[in-house]
Amino acid sequence: MASALADAMTSSGRDLVVLDHGGWRRHPWAEVHQRAENIAARITEDAATVVVLVGEPTVEFIAAIPGTLYAGAALSILPGPVRGADLGQWARNTMQRCASIGVRLVFSHGEHLDALRATPASIPTCDVTETGHARRDSSFTPPDHGEFAVLQGTAGSTGIPRTAQLSPEAVLANLRGLVACIDITPADTGCSWLPLYHDMGLAFLLTNALGGAELWQAPTTAFSASPFSWLQWMTESTATLTAAPNMAYGLIGKYGSRLTDFDLGALRFALNGGEPVDCQGYRRFATEMARFGLDPSALVPAYGLAESSCAVTVPILGSGLQVDEVQVSSDDGRFIRTHAVVGEPIPGMQVRIAPTDGSGEQVDGRDFGEIEVRGTSLMSGYLGEPPLEAGSWFPTGDLGYFVDSGLVVCGRAKELITVAGRNIFPAEVERVAAQVQGVREGAVVAVGTDESAVRPGLVIAAEFRGTDEPAARTELVQRVASECGVVPSNVVFLEPGALPRTSSGKLRRLEVKRSMEDVNR
């Protein structure tokens, strides 16, 4: 894997373009490679076998990714502090996390570096900027690669976060599969603000590097501060490739009618992954962006997971958003569920649907079950747990089914809501609830409470910033009852930012469920 990246970067005539201190700065991939070798030399000198990166995506920070791989060490990228967090406590927690996964060297920069160095931890912590610019007396000779290339944290949205151990062969197979499916060439330009500690952000960066494309990389904090800047970045870069979670497309689509003066005519690949795809919101994004030249065939709803290095399925290039509609019966009539088709397995991967113990539904001829995967991109196992057997099927915990055009993912098995014997996927309720004025986009959780609760059934918790809670609550109940065929037993409005999330921004539905059950006992 290291040699493949080195060859791609040294032979590329394109650039890495980084948003740094408010301005875009160009760095040829060959320069990034040179800085990566400087960092690799330091890792080799320290004989570090596991390296952690923490910080904003500067050119040196990004160079440390291939640099770690060049040194044959295992890479783990950890998130910085969330807004409003205590910096000292974050630093202590981060160093404890480093110790738990066997880290031997930490690279960071700026205030993050200062905070990490102020902890009592004994793990060496280096300035990635200084190391990237260090002069070497001799050329770097890469050692043999280690057993693992990446230690990727899982989201932990339905349980305790774990660490997936990914071999160099698995990561490279996934990257090559993506390059083939997307047909990345040096003529392409990628644009991303995804966090590099998330598997989707890391894979997007590395696929562009491996494919010889130009990449414009912005910090996630820059998107969070000004989401519509994403459109400006794609316009400035003449981006052909981008990727984002569903909430970003939903946000842009919701307020798209207010926007002017963008050019998305070059965009041919806009991947939607990392969370359930809201077909209505994704379509609205395409409709609103059409006047800026967006071709709807660029929409790419995909499926992946950290345990499979990143991607599992991707639709055929240019097919756009394809949906499957399922008619569901309830006591109040028949309702239609709409799910995105997330395509076929990438090269080297296989997917099957395994029967479940009553957690799926047999509707309209679809065989619902748990999605299981295996293949060349699959992890070796979780850190601290027994390794996976070679060639074994890995149960993802996701429910879905197949149609002629590919896989359909319905939701997490642990998050399935059962009301009066009927199974409901949280995403369909959350999509409807988010349409109520004052309810924050991407800040709604639907859960089911058990029979021991005072008000068992469907409970909706939503961050609310409107002025008329009673009217909004009434509208929400009516909308959900009309469109989903179930009446919520309770609706709870919360302050913005109150819902618990993972480090990658995913809502922790099971934590909300426990809180709602505790309150209602």
UniProtKB/Swiss-Prot annotation:
Q: In which pathway does it act?
A: Siderophore biosynthesis; mycobactin biosynthesis
- Superkingdom as given in the UniProt entry: Bacteria
GO MF, one term, reads: ATP binding
User: Which enzyme type, at the first EC level?
Assistant: ligase
Similarity-based family = Belongs to the ATP-dependent AMP-binding enzyme family.
Pfam assignment, any one = AMP-binding
Extent of the signal sequence? none
Which named protein is this? Medium/long-chain-fatty-acid--[acyl-carrier-protein] ligase MbtM
Q: Which InterPro entries does this entry report, sorted A to Z?
A: AMP-bd_C_sf (IPR045851), AMP-binding_CS (IPR020845), AMP-dep_synth/lig_dom (IPR000873), ANL_N_sf (IPR042099), FAAL/FAAC (IPR040097)
Any idea of its EC number?
Answer: 6.2.1.20, 6.2.1.47
GO CC terms in record: plasma membrane
Keyword annotations from UniProtKB, A to Z: ATP-binding, Ligase, Nucleotide-binding
Q: Kindly state a single biological-process term from the GO annotations of this entry.
A: fatty acid biosynthetic process
Catalytic reaction equation(s): a long-chain fatty acid + holo-[ACP] + ATP = a long-chain fatty acyl-[ACP] + AMP + diphosphate; a medium-chain fatty acid + holo-[ACP] + ATP = a medium-chain fatty acyl-[ACP] + AMP + diphosphate
Known function: Activates lipidic moieties required for mycobactin biosynthesis. Converts medium- to long-chain aliphatic fatty acids into acyl adenylate, which is further transferred on to the phosphopantetheine arm of the carrier protein MbtL.
What SUPFAM superfamilies has UniProt attached to this entry? Acetyl-CoA synthetase-like
Q: Which Gene3D superfamilies match?
A: 3.30.300.30, N-terminal domain of ligase-like
